């Protein structure tokens, strides 16, 4: 196994964020540096750089990993090398060039630590989230954002409406998109907006997606041209899949595609000029 620590730029990593192509991000700053900062890179979880053997076995199989420290110096490089020499043969790992400071300078999104219990998640203890069964829009959009920006290992539970709060307490799960909880509708805004607000995620593409979600979820398709289409696709997925988790799996692709379109393809047009005769 190659023992050389390989770097990835903040710009490259930003381009991967918000999709299934994104690597697993591990914050390996020294504990004092981690505790002194109020944010982590979006989707990152903290792991002790001096106890790699304690958490290595809990990493998911066959997923690329990026580790970062403050400036991309010895802490992240040493951790990266340790992962690459783990003997598993499956840990393709890189370190973030310039660390979290380079990420912030490049405008990469971060999330506020402690905006919800158990975030960032601990070793072998992913956050759990619970909401009403038979999701349509917000209850698919929120899990997408949680997996892509907050906790990539998060687990989701769908329950009958009258059981959500009881089961949330029983299973130490975070309730969302139900009345009277932290992550729910606020005025004319939906639960997706509440997550962005409370985790203080500063990402223009995510803000644009939030407008589309809000229009589809609150019956205001005039908010964004894509809202009506998202509503149609969401209702179609609900009609196709009786299993809520299967619908979530399919819905993740929808939001990956919408987010990618916002980031990279909004200016692209499609017409029939190719078929017109000269």
Identify the meaning behind each predicted range:
Residues 157:
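Segments forming glycine/polar-rich beta-alpha architectures that bind adenosine-containing cofactors
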Residues 186-190:
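C-terminal catalytic/acceptor-binding lobe
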Residues 1-24, 28-66, 71-143, 148-153, ...:
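Rhodanese-like catalytic fold shared by cysteine-dependent sulfurtransferases
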Residues 241-244:
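Terminal low-complexity "docking" segments
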Residues 162-164:
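Intrinsically disordered cytosolic tails
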Residues 224-229:
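Short, well-ordered alpha-helical segments
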